[in-house]
C-alpha cells in the first residue's frame, strides 16, 4: 500500500487560506460526476500528446511528466522512449528520458495510441510541458511526476503562471512532499491519496483532508470488496463535503472494469471523479445518468402531493420510504442504475396508491348496511310482485 499527495495549485491570491485554494471544479459539491481522461484521448491520438489532450472534452486530463538530462519537463509515461517513440523515418529509438537532452527528444515522433510496434508513426512529436500549457490553455491538467522532479516542473508552472490550470500528483511520503512545497513562494493546497485496504488509514486520510479544508481525496485498493467501498466511508466523504476520486486505469481499481458496469458500481459507492481510458464513453454514460436524475426529480415533485390520510397505511409507508430514497438520490451522488431503480420503485408505488384509492371507493360503495339490506329486500319483493302480476294477467 502507498500514500500519495495530489497537489492542487491555484492563483496567488487564493493561497492565503488553504480552504480557498481549490479550483472551481474541485469545489463543485453538486451531484455532478466529473471525468478525468488518462493520458488524454489516447484511443484516437498518441498518449500524452497535445492532440490527445485537445481531443478531450472532459473536466480533467491526467498526463505523465519526465525530466530530460538538461532539466526540461516533457510528457512521457515510461522512463524510456522505447515504447512510444520513433525517428523521422519511423525507425525505433531507445533511451532513458533522463539521459537524453531536450534537443534530442523533441525530434522524436510519437506512435499512435499507446505505442508499441503495432502502432504506426504519427505527425505528433514529444511535447515539452511548457508547450502543452501554452497550447491547451483552459484544460485542467493533472500532472503525474516524481518528487525528485518537483523543482523542474514547478518552475515551468510558475513561469507560465499556470497555477489555476494544474493539479500536481506526486508520489512520495507526505512529510517529504509537504517539506519540499513549503520552501516554495507559492504553497499549493494538497489532496491526500491512499491506496490500500486498512479502514483506519482510509478514515485517517479523509479526516486529514477534511481538517485541512480540502475538497478531494483519492482512494484505491486491489481488493474487490475493499474497505474503500464501505458505507461509512461514503458517508464520511459526503458529510465532509469531500469528492471521492477513483482511477479505473491502474492496479488499484478494485478489479473493476473500465466500462459502464464498473463506473456504475464505483459511483454507487460515493465516488464522483472517475479517471478513465474512455472519456467519450464515460461522458455519454454521465449524460444518460443526468437524464435519469431529471426524470426522477420530476417524479419526486409530482409525488409530493400524496397525503397519508387518503391511502392505506401499509402501502403509504412503503411509498414514503421509496419517496425519501428518491429525494435523496435525485439531489445527491448517484449512479444511473440507482436513479433508474429508484424511479421504477417510486413509480410502481404511486400506481399502487392510485389503485388503492380507487379500490377504497368501490368497497365503500359496496359496503353492507341495514338500510341497504332493507332496500335490497324491497327491490326484490317489487320484482317478485311484478312477475306474479304479469303471470296472473296472462292466465286470464
Where are the regions that the model predicts?
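Generic detector of short, well-ordered, non-transmembrane alpha-helical segments enriched
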Residues: 1, 12-15, 322
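Sec-dependent N-terminal signal peptides
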Residues: 1-7, 376
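Beta-rich interaction/scaffold domains
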Residues: 289-379, 383-395
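Phosphate-group recognition and catalysis centered on beta-loop-alpha active-site segments
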Residues: 8-291
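Hydrophobic alpha-helical membrane-insertion segments, chiefly the h-region
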Residues: 7-15, 381-388
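Short beta-strand element of the conserved SAM-dependent methyltransferase core
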Residues: 5, 75, 365-366
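Generic secretory/membrane-interface signal
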Residues: 2, 58, 138, 379-381
Amino acid at each position: 500500500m502507498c500514500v500519495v499527495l495530489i497537489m492542487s495549485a491555484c492563483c496567488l491570491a487564493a493561497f492565503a487560506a488553504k480552504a480557498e485554494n481549490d479550483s472551481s471544479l474541485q469545489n463543485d459539491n453538486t451531484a455532478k460526476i466529473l471525468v478525468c481522461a488518462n493520458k488524454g484521448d489516447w484511443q484516437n491520438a498518441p498518449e500524452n500528446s497535445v492532440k490527445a489532450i485537445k481531443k478531450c472534452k472532459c473536466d480533467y486530463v491526467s498526463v505523465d511528466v519526465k525530466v530530460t538530462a538538461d532539466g526540461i519537463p516533457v510528457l512521457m509515461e515510461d522512463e524510456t522512449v522505447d515504447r512510444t517513440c520513433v525517428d523521422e523515418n519511423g525507425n525505433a529509438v531507445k533511451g532513458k528520458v533522463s539521459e537524453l537532452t531536450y534537443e534530442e527528444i523533441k525530434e522524436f515522433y510519437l506512435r499512435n495510441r499507446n505505442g508499441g510496434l503495432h502502432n504506426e508513426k504519427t505527425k505528433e512529436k514529444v511535447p515539452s510541458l511548457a508547450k502543452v500549457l501554452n497550447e491547451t490553455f483552459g484544460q485542467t491538467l493533472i500532472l503525474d511526476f516524481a518528487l525528485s522532479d518537483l523543482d523542474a516542473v514547478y518552475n515551468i508552472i510558475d513561469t507560465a503562471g499556470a497555477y489555476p490550470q494544474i493539479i500536481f500528483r506526486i508520489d512520495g511520503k507526505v512529510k517529504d512532499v509537504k517539506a519540499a512545497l513549503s520552501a516554495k513562494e507559492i504553497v499549493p493546497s494538497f489532496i491526500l491519496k491512499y491506496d490500500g485496504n486498512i479502514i483506519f488509514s482510509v478514515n485517517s486520510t479523509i479526516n486529514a483532508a477534511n481538517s485541512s479544508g480540502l475538497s478531494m481525496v483519492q482512494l484505491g485498493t486491489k481488493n474487490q470488496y475493499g474497505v474503500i467501498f464501505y458505507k461509512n466511508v461514503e458517508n464520511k466523504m459526503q458529510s465532509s463535503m469531500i469528492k471521492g476520486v477513483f482511477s479505473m486505469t491502474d492496479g488499484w481499481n478494485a478489479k473493476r472494469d473500465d466500462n459502464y458496469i464498473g463506473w456504475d458500481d464505483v459511483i454507487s459507492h460515493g465516488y464522483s471523479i472517475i479517471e478513465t481510458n474512455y472519456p467519450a464513453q464515460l461522458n455519454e454514460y454521465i449524460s444518460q445518468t443526468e437524464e435519469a436524475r431529471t426524470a426522477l426529480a420530476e417524479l419526486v415533485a409530482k409525488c409530493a402531493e400524496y397525503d397519508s390520510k387518503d391511502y392505506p397505511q401499509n402501502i403509504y409507508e412503503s411509498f414514503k420510504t421509496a419517496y425519501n430514497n428518491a429525494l435523496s438520490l435525485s439531489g445527491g451522488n448517484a449512479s444511473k442504475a440507482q436513479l433508474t431503480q429508484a424511479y421504477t420503485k417510486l413509480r410502481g408505488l404511486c400506481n399502487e396508491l392510485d389503485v388503492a384509492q380507487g379500490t377504497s371507493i368501490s368497497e365503500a360503495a359496496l359496503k353492507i348496511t341495514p338500510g341497504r339490506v332493507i332496500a335490497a329486500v324491497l327491490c326484490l319483493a317489487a320484482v317478485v310482485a311484478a312477475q306474479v302480476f304479469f303471470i296472473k294477467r296472462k292466465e286470464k
